[in-house]
């Protein structure tokens, strides 16, 4: 079976080329164009050439006088060519600004000036190879479908062939567009041409649509501003009645074009306001309650939940190195006024967090007032007693390098364990069970030894030599090591000789004094009256605060008094 394809009539028919050019122009402008192309793509020349394609019949599904369906293998390497004409934007900055949002791009003055250049592109040397499904019917026309991408290569000649990177860019972009054209647009173009050629009804309907479109396009256009609107307003927004509109004439200063509809103005204003959200300068929102507070006073107004003392809470506390010190051997916070102005003390944020988050935020103000009362500066006559007591406590409870690798931590002056030189006040202080439960990593042996030694010292009132011997005996009983004595004993001796200078010298306890020295304790008698007066004052303040907070913290103190535990620091 043989078929004869007559290719010459297609080359000779001028109307066929005209119609094909129009269809190709519509197809090229229908798809989204790159932003560099600023004008329509017009097909100025189309020629199918004199070399027909080669067709190989693979399958014939239906064959009759008025219909045909089969599968072909097509190969084409002829002299057909296509010429396109358009305009492109030569300034890349102008193209970049047009494709980006206005609020996110700079505003150049002259650098973004558009520069359009006419461009002419000629496509030639087509090489096609693919499988084609062809369906022919006199009633339905010709349908051609490519099962694969038929375009192998082509040659692109343009105005910018002298610029290599522009030539390569155009070659790549046009090849991509032609692949879409062969797979989607070319079958539709061939189908419409076949309907126009073999179906008279389709031709008549198409001619009628063309006449209707040309008739609508003729004649002058209507000016929507020629007649006044239904609800006219002047340039200032004042409403106008019918008599004022009729009084206006063509010779008057107020023209009809200056009358605008109030409804349209409101719509334009609403549209403008809605577009303002795209700008970076969005107006602030009024009547909005902000849930995030930055100041501590705003935080106290909000109702907070009760925080467990076993989980530390981050709290905003004004603390500085050298002004606050804590004892982290238990879960509760033990803080006092610093005994040194130099940054030699260790600071524990964990203790501060536990102390700040023990109670609910409703009692935050009362807790803050109580802390302020306990941290009032001491008078000048109490300074020697405070320094003597502090140095004595540090010398009794400080560990050695061999037994405790932890740094030397300061005992607090407001701790009930430190000042109870009178036994009556020490035996009735309440116990806090959290300290007993949370002291897991470090034993409380040092705290008990210190309290027992201070209690024995208060009862017997020994001399400074007896105090030094008791310190060495207790230190040996706690841990098996050589009898050592810290620098606190020597500071204690200086406190007796110069009470004014002992307050500053005894407070300078740094971490560099960890190595203890072996020397014999020598010193004077501690001013016992001042120490007892200080201990009584602290105990009286704690009893007053306990009675003042009985309504809010009554169950807390009762629960602590029922449990048996060594007397630790106060509960807050």
Swiss-Prot record:
State the signal peptide span. Answer: none
In its UniProt record, a GO molecular function of this protein is: lipid binding
Basic and acidic residues bias spans: 371-381
Q: Residue limits of the SMP-LTD domain? A: 1-195
State if Kinase is listed as a keyword. no
Tell me which CDD domains the record gives.
SMP_Mdm34 (cd21673)
The record ties this protein, via InterPro entries, to:
Mdm34, SMP_LBD
Q: Where in the cell is it found?
A: Mitochondrion outer membrane
Q: Where is the composition biased (Polar residues)?
A: 387-400
Q: Where is the composition biased (Basic residues)?
A: 358-370
**Keyword Zinc applies:** no
Relate the protein's function as given in its record: Component of the ERMES/MDM complex, which serves as a molecular tether to connect the endoplasmic reticulum (ER) and mitochondria. Components of this complex are involved in the control of mitochondrial shape and protein biogenesis, and function in nonvesicular lipid trafficking between the ER and mitochondria. Mdm34 is required for the interaction of the ER-resident membrane protein mmm1 and the outer mitochondrial membrane-resident beta-barrel protein mdm10.
Please give the record's comment on domains.
Lacks alpha-helical transmembrane segments, suggesting that it resides in the membrane via beta-sheet conformations similar to those predicted for other outer membrane proteins and porin. The SMP-LTD domain is a barrel-like domain that can bind various types of glycerophospholipids in its interior and mediate their transfer between two adjacent bilayers.
PANTHER family hit by this protein: MITOCHONDRIAL DISTRIBUTION AND MORPHOLOGY PROTEIN 34 (PTHR28185:SF1)
Q: What is this protein called?
A: Mitochondrial distribution and morphology protein 34
Which organism does this record belong to?
A: Aspergillus fumigatus (strain ATCC MYA-4609 / CBS 101355 / FGSC A1100 / Af293)
